[in-house]
């Protein structure tokens, strides 16, 4: 992705909006009747030039392959980091099966990922800016700082809840539920922004919710956990995992709705592109999580934190940075996975923004849905998971609902384009 002239600022809009803007040098309207012949010649020449510059099949294949390769690798590494256990020390004669530990340092993982994303996002922003022009500021106005801080806080808080849920549910349930972002986004739009939705959207939400519930209830380990919890008189740990994941999805929804508000309000915050959001959000997230990791041990050692908070914080949380460094020094193979996870995540975002700059958001919706399905299938085969008939039914309901939404949106977009063409 060499330095090139960007067609137009990439703006993240709602899923039914077209992301690909027309270039600035497209033929302009000529109001002078005497110049109509010259205007027609200019129009013909510009159309030939536009056709020559239009993205082709190989460019489409490059974008799709980049998104698939980046996020499928990212998903495999995420599952390996968060679910695989490692022995605390090598086996000995006295202890042939030593205790095992798992990477549970979500704030550290989030910090590394946001750092990679901020750097790569800035490089994309720099090289996609036309030569001779100033690189767009990631904080163009003072008004935009508050929503950007809110986005960085909500995205930084979402990850710990999501990773904590993996202690109670399996990765397949996690991935399937993460595919259902429409539910919290709609909830927040209805309650905060008083936005109305077409009837089919509620049908999609119903299908997705039923799918996740079906998948969870038919999980082989879920019934065992519920039965064991019933004999103990306690609530099932899988229910607690779903609760933690629900908080994660709600925070993700807050992140997405705030981003939509920024992009759809240029009169308040000026025009703000996708790469600008990527850099600003990840820079602020890195600052917030880094400050937390560095300040938390000092607050803990002085006793100020325990005096303020009514609930005690686990020691592992107070010294997460030290504990994470110690864990990675004991298991250097995990460090490679963490760095690869951050790199693939950042590259995936770059391919998404590049795809949006060359094609429409409709293509991206299709690629995203199929990518999530492939992530689940890759997890099944890579890590040897087995799925029951009920779980396959749940997966079918979820992706059937998401796919139906994509089809309806595509038809709506075609209808709008046809109507606009008739009025020209």
From Swiss-Prot:
Gene name for this UniProt entry: hut1
The UniProt record lists the keyword Endoplasmic reticulum: yes
Topology term for the membrane: Multi-pass membrane protein
Species annotation: Emericella nidulans (strain FGSC A4 / ATCC 38163 / CBS 112.46 / NRRL 194 / M139)
Name the record gives this protein: UDP-galactose transporter homolog 1
Gene3D superfamilies noted in UniProt: 1.10.3730.20
Residues with attached carbohydrate: 256
Protein's UniProt keywords contain Mitochondrion: no
Keywords from the named record: Endoplasmic reticulum, Glycoprotein, Membrane, Sugar transport, Transmembrane, Transmembrane helix, Transport
Origin: domain of life: Eukaryota
Family that this chain belongs to: Belongs to the nucleotide-sugar transporter family. SLC35B subfamily.
GO MF annotations in UniProt: UDP-galactose transmembrane transporter activity; UDP-glucose transmembrane transporter activity
GO biological process terms held by the UniProt record: UDP-galactose transmembrane transport; UDP-glucose transmembrane transport into endoplasmic reticulum
Function: May be involved in specific transport of UDP-Gal from the cytosol to the Golgi lumen. Involved in the maintenance of optimal conditions for the folding of secretory pathway proteins in the endoplasmic reticulum.
Segments passing through the bilayer: 57-77, 107-127, 144-164, 173-193, 197-217, 234-254, 293-313, 337-357, 380-400
Principal place of residence: endoplasmic reticulum
Cellular compartments annotated: Endoplasmic reticulum membrane
InterPro entries recorded: SCL35B1-4/HUT1
Cellular component aspect of the GO annotation: endoplasmic reticulum membrane; Golgi membrane
Pfam family, one: UAA
